């Protein structure tokens, strides 16, 4: 199962809410929206390359909602420090996310919830976010609302 549109929207909204002061200063909101779209698009391309054969593989959790939500949070953290220039971004980010290929075993579907214990999905997404960011050397921006 891939992520539901509402789940994806909630993660993007969380990012926008966290960066709102910067976003509202943009004079061309359409261009700003295109910029964020490009960031997410390029991040997902880089993530696909970094995950390799685990991407869209039913035997792994790399493209399940819990991990995709965590990856969008990593995307927001990475974009804060390395969104520009857009040229070469996929290659830069693929290199940055390449340690994720070493995480493939942890993201096998079998035993996944035991390897990432949590009280619920909100806590599990936060944990996976921290683990993926740490593996890629990306600083996690803490937010007041952690959900």
Residue ranges and their predicted role:
Residues 1-147:
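Accessory terminal alpha-helical modules
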């Amino acid at each position: 199962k891939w992520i539901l549109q509402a789940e994806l929207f909630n993660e993007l909204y969380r990012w926008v809410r966290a960066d709102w002061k910067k976003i509202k200063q943009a004079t061309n909101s359409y261009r700003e929206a295109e910029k964020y779209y490009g960031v997410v698009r390029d991040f997902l391309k880089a993530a696909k390359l970094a995950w390799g054969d685990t991407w869209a593989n039913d035997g792994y959790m790399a493209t399940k909602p819990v991990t995709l939500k965590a990856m969008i949070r990593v995307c927001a953290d990475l974009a804060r420090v390395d969104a520009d220039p857009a040229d070469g971004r996929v290659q830069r980010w693929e290199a940055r996310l390449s340690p994720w290929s070493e995480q493939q075993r942890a993201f096998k579907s079998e035993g996944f919830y035991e390897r990432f214990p949590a009280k619920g999905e909100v806590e599990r997404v936060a944990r996976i976010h921290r683990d993926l960011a740490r593996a890629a050397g990306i600083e996690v921006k803490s937010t007041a609302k952690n959900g």
